[in-house]
Amino acid sequence: MTEFTHINQQGHAKMVDVSDKQITKRTAVAHSSITVNETIYKQISNNTNTKGNVLNTAQIAGIMAAKNTSTIIPMCHPLPLTGIDVHFNWDETNAPLYTLNIQTTVSTTGKTGVEMEALTAASATALTIYDMTKAVDKGMIIGETYLESKSGGKSGDFQRQLDQ
């Protein structure tokens, strides 16, 4: 059974000491999504939302979220991130509902991974889209948020299988 590394001998929270870990290149890819109605889909696609360019703003929010993960997730180490990218892809197969898939990729060269940074970026991106379009419809659905893959580090690589 795997031990919880964020709990000390007294059962209290602690930040894991990574001093003795090797510096390696680490990358994580996360996914989230938001399902919107046709009006919001058209506003985003045509860049006609009254609050501005929704995707550009959400992309910046995702980047900022990755950079600030250690300030909102208590046991995350502050990391010198070397790359952050946010991609969007529309799924139009269930019209009149449209799902915007969000993929975030975060990289570093360091002693601990960037999974939480990628997940935080994906979440903040979806939340920003909700915030910027909620005046049109509050019934949007933020979908599953999960780690797609990670590479580097002691625990090795991870690739989510389609049936997970």
UniProtKB/Swiss-Prot annotation:
This is Cyclic pyranopterin monophosphate synthase. Keywords: Lyase, Molybdenum cofactor biosynthesis. The lineage of its organism: Bacteria, Bacillati, Bacillota, Bacilli, Bacillales. Its EC number is 4.6.1.17. Homohexamer; trimer of dimers. It catalyses: (8S)-3',8-cyclo-7,8-dihydroguanosine 5'-triphosphate = cyclic pyranopterin phosphate + diphosphate. The active site is at residue 131. Pathway: Cofactor biosynthesis; molybdopterin biosynthesis. Belongs to the MoaC family. HAMAP family: MoaC_B (MF_01224_B). It is an enzyme of class 4 (lyase). Gene3D superfamilies: Molybdopterin cofactor biosynthesis C (MoaC) domain. SUPFAM superfamilies: Molybdenum cofactor biosynthesis protein C, MoaC (SSF55040). PANTHER family: MOLYBDOPTERIN COFACTOR SYNTHESIS PROTEIN A. It comes from Staphylococcus aureus (strain MRSA252). One of its GO terms (molecular function) is cyclic pyranopterin monophosphate synthase activity. One of its GO terms (biological process) is Mo-molybdopterin cofactor biosynthetic process. Substrate binds at residues 75-77, 116-117. InterPro entries: MoaC, MoaC_bact/euk, MoaC_sf, MoCo_biosynth_MoaA/MoaC, Mopterin_CF_biosynth-C_dom. It comes from the Bacteria. It holds the Pfam family MoaC. Catalyzes the conversion of (8S)-3',8-cyclo-7,8-dihydroguanosine 5'-triphosphate to cyclic pyranopterin monophosphate (cPMP).
